[in-house]
Amino acid sequence: LYEEAMKKGVDVNELVIDALIKALNLDPETTAKARLELATKHLNEGRDLIDKDPAQASEKLYKAAEEVVKALAAHFNLELLQRVGERGRWTVAELERAVEEISERVGSWFVDSWDHAWALHVWGFHEAKLDARAVGLRAPYVERMVREARRLTAAE
């Protein structure tokens, strides 16, 4: 099953997290913390891959940023979570909307950081056009997203 899921581009970790959140009916803060654990895992894996495999590093770093967006959407209990829950998955448009709403609360740096993560996803992973240097230049933006999200969820 795992290999079949990977062939079809299904993120098994994401699938498991989503299923557990739904099955256990987790509260927003527990959901945020679980997503931040996954974000930290992706961040660490991404950092480790920058010099070895920039394309995979790009995707891991993007996934870290994506999990931060989902974590903070839960933390701030954004209204769009209802639509996401009904559909059972996030769309790119909903991720973008969540980024905008989160940015209104935490500052414009969040949109800037997301834009760097999106470049990693598109140009670093899908197009495989970014080398280790280019990925390394963008990694600190994702690191800030993870660090600040952990701070925000611990403080509030």
Task: Give the ranges of each region predicted by the language model.
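Short amphipathic alpha-helical segments
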Residues: 1, 8-21
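Short, charged, low-complexity loops and linkers
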Residues: 17-27, 47-51, 98
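Short, positively charged interaction helices/loops
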Residues: 26-48
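Non-transmembrane, amphipathic alpha-helical segments
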Residues: 31, 49, 53-57, 127-130, ...
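Generic structural signal for well-ordered, non-membrane alpha-helices
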Residues: 37-44, 63-70, 115-118, 144-147
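Hydrophobic alpha-helical packing segments in soluble, helical-rich domains
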Residues: 54-76
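Long, charged low-complexity segments
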Residues: 73-156
